[in-house]
Amino acid sequence: MRRETVVSAAPEDVWRVVSDPARLPAWWPSVSRVEEASPQAWTKVLMSPGGKAVRADYTRVEAEEPVRIQWRHEVEESPFERILSASTTEITMEPRDGGTLVRISVEHRPRGWARFSPFQMRAAATRQVSGALDGLTRLFGEESG
C-alpha cells in the first residue's frame, strides 16, 4: 500500500528526519521511543491502544540520500511473527515546487490467520502510513497550491 503528500521542506530536510531512527517518535504513529538506535538498526517501542509497550526491531536495507530509504521489520522471534512473514517500508522524496513529494510504501506479507484478513491488514497499513504522512506534515507543514 502506498500514500503520498507534499510537505513544505527541501528533500534534504525531510531526509534528515526520515533517515534518523531517533526521530521516529516525532512523526511515526504509536512510537513512544526508539532504543539502541544506529543508522543501520534500531528498536521501536510502540504503544498499543490499551497502553501496552511492544518492541519492534528494524534494519535499514537501502538508502540513497536524499532520495530513498528502505527498512525491514525483523519479524522473526517477535510478537509480530504470528501474523507477518515479512514487512518492509520504503520512503521516497522528490523535489516538488519548493517542497518535497514524500511517498511511503509499506509491504506486509501476512502469515497464519492474517492471510485470511486482507482487508484488516490493508486498513492497518493505511492507518499507519497515513499517520506517518500526517506526522511529517505536522513537522514541516503542507505545501499549498
Model-derived segments and their meaning:
Residues 1-39:
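Hydrophobic ligand-binding cavity/cleft-lining segments
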Residues 25-26, 33-36, 51-101, 107-109, ...:
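Hydrophobic-ligand binding "helix-grip"
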Residues 101, 108-145:
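A conserved amphipathic terminal alpha-helix motif
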